[in-house]
Amino acid sequence: MQDTKFKVAVVQAAPVFMDAPASVAKAIGFIAEAGAAGAKLLAFPEVWIPGYPWWLWLGTPAWGMQFVPRYHANSLRADGPDILALCAAAAEAKINVVMGFSEIDGGTLYLSQVFISDAGEIIFKRRKLKPTHVERTLYGEGDGSDFRVVESSVGRLGALCCAEHIQPLSKYAMYSMNEQVHVASWPSFTLYRDKAYALGHEVNLAASQIYALEGGCFVLHASAITGQDMFDMLCDTPEKADLLNAEGAKPGGGYSMIFGPDGQPMCEHLPQDKEGILYADVDLSMIAIAKAAYDPTGHYARGDVVRLMVNRSPRRTSVSFSEDENAAVTFTET
C-alpha cells in the first residue's frame, strides 16, 4: 500500500549559468542533501540547466545571438550522460526528482522537465506546450502528449512550466487526470521589477497557489535565483542591469514555496537571495477533504454545459511511406 505521508522538497538556487556540467554537479549536491533529509520528491526550477536565457528580455535579437551557440552547447539530450548522472544521483539518494532543463533534440531546443523515479529511472519527460513571448525565438513547442500525470512512489505526479499556470485550458487538462502532486517550475523573479507586475513574484506565486486550490493537489513551486554570473555575462550596460534587477546588479528573485491542496502555504520563504531547499510534510489524504468542496473536473463540473477537448497525440514533423507493387501505401511515423 502506498504511503500517503512523506516529505517533499523544493530547490531555490541559481545554476552555474550556461555551464551544464557544473550545474549538474550542483544539482547532484541538492539531490543528495534532500535525500539525506528524508525527502521523497525534489523539484527544480524552469530550465535550471543551464539557466534561464535572460538575454531574450534585455536586448535585440541581433545582440542576443552571441549567446545562442553556447546555450545550445550546454543544453541536454533527454537520454544523454548528464540526465543519466541525475538518474544515478536520484537512485543513490532514493528520491524522486523533477528537473527543469533546456532540451536539445536535433537542432531545436525545448523548455523541458524530466521526471526521475527514486530508482533512478526516467518515468516521463515533457516539453512546455507554448514558449512565452520572446522565448519563442529560442525554443520549440511541445504537443498534447506533454499533458500527462504519471504514477510514482509519491502519488500521481504532474508538472508544468512557468506561465503554463495561467493557461486555463492547460490547467483543466491536468486537473482532469486526478493529479495529486504538482511541480510548478518557474525561473527567478527579478526581471522588470516595478515595470511589469505580471512577471513578478506576487502574481505568479498566486498562480501556483490557485493551481493548488483548483486542482486539489499539492504544488511545489520551484523558483530559481538570478545569479551574479548572469549579470556579469549579460548586463553590458546599466540599462540592462536595471531591466534584470531594478534593486541592483546582484543575486535575487528566489521565491520558492510549497502549497497544500487547499491553497495554504506549507513552509516559510527563504530570503530571495538565499540558496537552499524548502521542505514540507504532506499527507495525500488531505486531498479528499479539499475535493469534497471543489472538484472542478468531477462533482463540481457540468460537462453538459462546458467541456474541454484535448488532442493528446504526439506531433510528428515527418511521415515515411512506401508503396508496394499492388499500389498499397504504408505510412510510418518518424
Swiss-Prot record:
Database matches in PROSITE patterns: CN_HYDROLASE, NITRIL_CHT_1, NITRIL_CHT_2
Catalysed reaction, written as an equation: a nitrile + 2 H2O = a carboxylate + NH4(+)
This enzyme's EC code(s): 3.5.5.1
Gene Ontology MF annotations: nitrilase activity; nitrile hydratase activity
Record flagged with keyword Transcription: no
Pfam family, one: CN_hydrolase
Domain CN hydrolase: 6-284
Enzyme class: hydrolase
Similarity remark: Belongs to the carbon-nitrogen hydrolase superfamily. Nitrilase family.
Self-association state and partner proteins as the record states: Homomultimer composed of 12 subunits.
Protein name in UniProt: Nitrilase bll6402
Biological source species: Bradyrhizobium diazoefficiens (strain JCM 10833 / BCRC 13528 / IAM 13628 / NBRC 14792 / USDA 110)
